[in-house]
């Protein structure tokens, strides 16, 4: 099951602005190593889960993983071959709107080479470019 909010105040939302860089969540808060986005784009709950599974499988249940993003934004879609009008379509899935600089995942308790490889594998699952970052003083 993909990530989705348990409850929302409003069922549907407008597109909103995608401009600018990440002002919050752009530094390491928990772990020693992180995966930081370089470009913007939507990230679905399925993509978050796919990256999480990839990282945890590579780590073989060692270390600690933090997921720093959550899909709050509902995306609607009309069924195929439906005429225009009759309102907005039903919610299909949820996304996290990712901006450049946002830290997506953090790791601790593993060597830097292992973390770097795990994040490289996870980056392949994501729809935008990311980079590996390390905390000041962490042995890389």
Swiss-Prot record:
Query: Among the record's GO biological process terms, what is one?
Result: translation
A molecular-function term among this protein's GO annotations: structural constituent of ribosome
Gene Ontology CC terms, in alphabetical order: cytosolic large ribosomal subunit
What is this protein's name? Large ribosomal subunit protein uL16
The free-text function statement in the UniProt record for this protein reads: Binds 23S rRNA and is also seen to make contacts with the A and possibly P site tRNAs.
Record family assignment: Belongs to the universal ribosomal protein uL16 family.
Known InterPro entries for this protein? Ribosomal_uL16, Ribosomal_uL16_bact-type, Ribosomal_uL16_CS, Ribosomal_uL16_dom, Ribosomal_uL16_sf
Starting at the broadest rank, the lineage of the source organism is: Bacteria, Pseudomonadati, Verrucomicrobiota, Opitutia, Opitutales
Q: List, alphabetically, the Pfam families matched.
A: Ribosomal_L16
Query: What organism is recorded for this protein?
Result: Opitutus terrae (strain DSM 11246 / JCM 15787 / PB90-1)
List keywords of the entry alphabetically: Ribonucleoprotein, Ribosomal protein, RNA-binding, rRNA-binding, tRNA-binding
PANTHER family assigned: 50S/60S RIBOSOMAL PROTEIN L16 (PTHR12220), LARGE RIBOSOMAL SUBUNIT PROTEIN UL16M (PTHR12220:SF13)
Q: Which domain of life is it from?
A: Bacteria
Q: How does it assemble?
A: Part of the 50S ribosomal subunit.
User: Where are the stretches annotated Disordered?
Assistant: 1-24
């Amino acid at each position: 099951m993909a990530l989705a909010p348990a409850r929302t105040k409003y069922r549907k939302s407008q597109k909103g602005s995608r401009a600018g860089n990440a002002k919050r969540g752009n530094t390491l808060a928990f772990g020693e190593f992180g995966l930081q986005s370089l470009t913007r784009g939507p990230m679905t709950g399925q993509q978050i889960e796919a990256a999480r599974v990839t990282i945890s499988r590579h780590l073989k249940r060692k270390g600690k993983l933090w997921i720093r993003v959550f899909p709050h934004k509902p995306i609607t879609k009309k069924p195929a071959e439906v005429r225009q009008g009759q309102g907005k379509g039903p919610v299909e899935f949820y996304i996290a709107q990712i901006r450049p600089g946002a830290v997506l995942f953090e790791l601790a308790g593993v060597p830097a080479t292992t973390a770097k490889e795990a994040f490289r594998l996870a980056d392949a699952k994501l729809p935008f470019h990311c980079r590996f970052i390390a905390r000041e003083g962490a042995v890389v």
